Amino acid sequence: MAISSAIIGWMIGSMMLVMAGGNTSPVTASVTINNYCAFTVSNTAINFGALNPGSNTIYSSNVITVTDSGNLGSNILTSGNSWTFASNTFGVTNTVWSSANVLYGSGTALTGTSADTAIVVTTSATNSIYFGLGVPAGQAPGTYSQTIEIISSC
């Protein structure tokens, strides 16, 4: 025996009326929102250009913008490793960072261990970290590379 869709609709409607007409009991819901520490950076590569041995860069073109994308503010730390090209190297401390666009000699030397920059990025905001580089006098020619880590501490 086939039941028409009108009868099924009436049956469902009747059940809803019966359920809606019954007793009610309040339910309390709760949720715990976790701390979420997250950020993004505007640039994942810094190109210091071509430099002569014994020279250094300006900061203005070597800026990383950090945007907080979590629900906590971020305190930014940074570290790095030595510059390398084939068997040639020079020190991590030749890279310097600053919270402002300053001269090379005014920056703080990058190290191999995480250092607190005192740069704070509040929730949903941005802040910048500027980098400079000084090439040692007499450094062998080549295209050197270095890894710089930007770390968020919430």
Q: How should these model regions be labeled?
A:
Residues 130-137:
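Short, hydrophobic beta-strand segments
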Residues 26, 54-57, 107-112, 128-130:
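A short linear-motif detector with a strong N-terminal bias
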Residues 71-76:
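Short acidic/proline- and small/hydrophobic-mixed sequence motifs that coincide with surface turns
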Residues 101-125:
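Extracellular adhesion/glycan-binding regions together with long Ser/Thr-
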Residues 12-55, 62, 67, 79-87, ...:
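Short, polar/proline-rich extracytoplasmic segments that appear immediately after membrane translocation
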Residues 4-14:
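Bacterial N-terminal signal peptides
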